[in-house]
Regions:
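Residues embedded in well-ordered regular secondary structure
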Residues: 1-94, 169, 176, 181, ...
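Extracellular/periplasmic, surface-exposed regions of secreted and cell-surface proteins
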Residues: 63, 106-115, 119-124, 174-261, ...
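A short glycine/small-residue-enriched secondary-structure motif
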Residues: 82-84, 262-273
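Short, functionally important structural connectors and interaction interfaces within domains
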Residues: 45-49, 53-54, 83, 106, ...
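Intrinsic-disorder/low-complexity loop/linker signature
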Residues: 28, 38-41, 48, 143-144, ...
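Proline-rich low-complexity regions
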Residues: 154-159, 262-264, 393
Length: 475
């Protein structure tokens, strides 16, 4: 038996197991199994002997290719790279598979008193996912009661065919399907009366008919400029530095989601429900913009060293979600939402921004006596308007005993011995958007006026007008 693979029963072993279980429990034997009166052994009605692990698992393939070009001169360097990555999963069928293209351009340029840095990255990925559970299709890809691929591989009987040409049309075999052109597309299925009720799905059918694809386009651009102010005005002093730095970044992500769950994937038996057949299409757009301005002074006078920083940051995140889904499709399938019997859609849009100011001073004398103080002032769009600002101070002092003359140990034995005390406050605004505002909802909001049902709107959430920063003190 290969390493990490279950030692599963073959058809003869399973037939004996099932027959003995039925005899011991005094329950009817499924009609596909018979007891040979001469040998005393149980046999299935045909010679089907499927090793589901051999059928479902395959050798995965991964490849990665990269082209890189770099160069530059005395004051300028650049790097350009192209990358291709492809990974085929270890399961037969639609997933998991992953493909990605990436292009990157980096550049650095320096003059006497200013340094510029830029970085541009674009990537495109295409991912096929497998059926893992019955969670939300955006997460796992399945809706309703269904056996996932891995569990089905373990539970399917060896007497069930992996592929079966007779299942292309099952109308005359499945009573509930008589009004539809149901088929299993040539994959093996089982019948309660023949095989018994095992509540599992053919993992090959599930992982081939289920389509769950996500395509992602992402762009990230960053840039910075670092200015040596003293050099710019003609003052060059190695003991004093005054720098201004601006950081800019912007990212944009567009995701396109596609999920198709045909009726057979929904079923854990050969009888099924078209009402669970579902096509979902959606797009997700995310963007993030950041600007940072920082001015720093660093100076040394004798044994005194001081570093002072003042800065401002602003970050804005935007989210735009659009999802449409349709239920119950006629065959042959043409997978567009308007071809569904019932269609639904929803969309959401969010914006989150935070503005911060920061000041910090670090001081040490002879690298023995240490002092640091910081204060932040942050304002968040998630909090109530008149109390959305918070102030968060911190302070620390330290003493390096190992720098004192009376320190009893040699530096080769103890090279650092420091006592430090600190106090600080942290802030948290990790909540949902617009929770300080009343939200009106129109979903199923109806009222009866003299026998006439009227659709309206109503406040659907509780409003807290005192949403402020959550603060935590640290020592």
């Amino acid at each position: 038996i290969p390493k990490d693979v279950y030692d599963v029963m073959n058809a003869d072993q399973y037939s004996q197991y099932l027959g003995q279980a039925a005899a011991n429990s005094n329950t009817p034997l499924p009609t596909g199994y018979k007891l040979d009166s001469q040998t005393g052994k149980y046999h299935f009605q045909d010679d089907t002997n499927t090793n589901w692990f051999d059928e479902v698992f395959k050798t995965g393939i991964r490849q990665n290719h990269n082209v890189n070009l770099s160069g530059g001169g005395a004051h300028n360097t650049y790097n350009i790279s192209l990358d291709y990555f492809n990974q085929k999963g270890t399961l037969e069928g639609a997933g998991p598979n992953y493909e990605r293209y990436t292009a990157r351009v980096n550049n650095t340029m320096e003059t006497k008193f200013i340094k510029f840095q830029t970085s541009l990255v674009y990537s495109h990925s295409d991912q096929d996912n497998m059926g893992l559970s019955n969670a939300s299709e955006y997460v796992q890809g399945l809706y309703g009661d269904v056996t996932n691929v891995l569990r089905g591989t373990l539970m399917m009987q060896p007497t069930i065919k992996a592929y079966d040409s007779s299942t292309w049309v099952l109308d005359n075999l499945v009573g509930i399907a008589n009004n539809f052109n149901y088929d299993a597309y040539g994959y093996g299925v089982y019948y309660d009366t023949v095989h018994g009720d095992i509540s599992a799905s053919n993992p090959l059918l599930v992982n081939n008919l289920l389509q769950r694809n996500t395509r992602v386009d992402r762009f990230v651009g960053t840039g910075s400029a670092d200015v040596d102010i003293l050099k710019m005005i003609g003052v060059d002093n190695k003991n004093h530095k005054l720098n201004y730095k601006v950081n800019l970044s912007y990212s944009k992500t567009h995701c396109k989601d596609f999920t198709w769950i045909p009726a057979w994937v929904q079923s854990n038996r050969v009888y099924l429900s078209k009402s669970n057949e579902r096509l979902t299409k959606g797009s997700r757009d995310y963007s993030d913009a950041l600007i940072e301005n920082v001015i720093t002074y660093d100076g040394t006078i004798g044994k005194h060293h001081i570093n002072v920083l003042a800065g401002q940051t602003y970050e804005e995140e935007d989210t735009d979600l659009l999802t449409g889904w349709g239920i119950n499709f006629t065959e042959p399938y043409f997978l567009q939402l308007q071809n569904a019997s019932d269609t639904y859609s929803e969309s959401y849009e969010y914006k989150h921004s935070i503005l911060s100011y920061i000041g910090r001073i670090n001081y040490n004398y002879d690298d023995r006596y240490l002092f640091s103080a910081t204060v932040r002032r942050d304002g968040s769009s998630r909090l109530t308007r008149n109390i959305r600002w918070g102030t968060f101070p911190s302070v620390s002092v330290g003493w390096r005993f190992d720098k004192e003359k009376f320190f009893p140990f040699d530096q080769n034995v103890v090279n650092l011995f420091k006592v430090r005390a600190s106090y600080g406050e942290l802030g948290n605004e990790n909540i949902g958007e617009y929770m300080y505002q009343a939200v009106m909802s129109r979903n199923n909001m109806t009222y009866n006026f003299n026998g006439n049902v009227v659709t309206g709107s109503a406040v659907s959430t509780f409003v807290d007008n005192n949403l402020a920063w959550e603060k935590k003190k640290t020592y």
